[in-house]
Amino acid sequence: MKKICLALFVSCFVFAFTLSQSANAATELKHWPAPVKEQLDKVIEKNANQGNFAVFDMDNTSYRYDLEESLLAYMEMKGALSREKLPQELRLIPFKDTKDFKEGLVSYYYRLCETEDLICYPWVAQVFAGFTLKELKGHVDGLMEYKKPLKAKYYSGDTVKEASINPPKPFTGMQELYAKLMENGINVYVM
């Protein structure tokens, strides 16, 4: 449980760099439809500078694509994670190797997801245990700067296929909203 909490905390922590970069004075909600912008402006004005806060989801709300999946692929590509370094307690099923293909962590993760999402999601969070927050943030920063799809091979049944895994792409409209909220004294938390 401690590992899962740390992984969730890291997910929240690493998004702070994007928020801090987007907070500049008098941000306009240019990427929002006019009726929604008007409603948001009213809500922000009503709640400004009163110690209020707003909480948002991260994956596919604050940005497009999944952080954990792309971070797994990125850290495996960089050699920070590997099946050899995988703790024994996270080896839930045998790796599926052939003479032509040695299964990596992305393929292993996908096979766990084929079994059950309730298995693969906690698993991928626990894969990052053992890294300090500073180390993980460095890897997330590297992933966000990479800006290219990551290549990985995986099993689809018994066939090896190639995946193209996109790193997260922050939604401009959400970045504007976060900046405007913070400019008006409303703390923003992204989980």
Regions found by a protein language model. Give the residues of each.
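Bacterial N-terminal signal peptides that target proteins for export
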Residues: 1-9
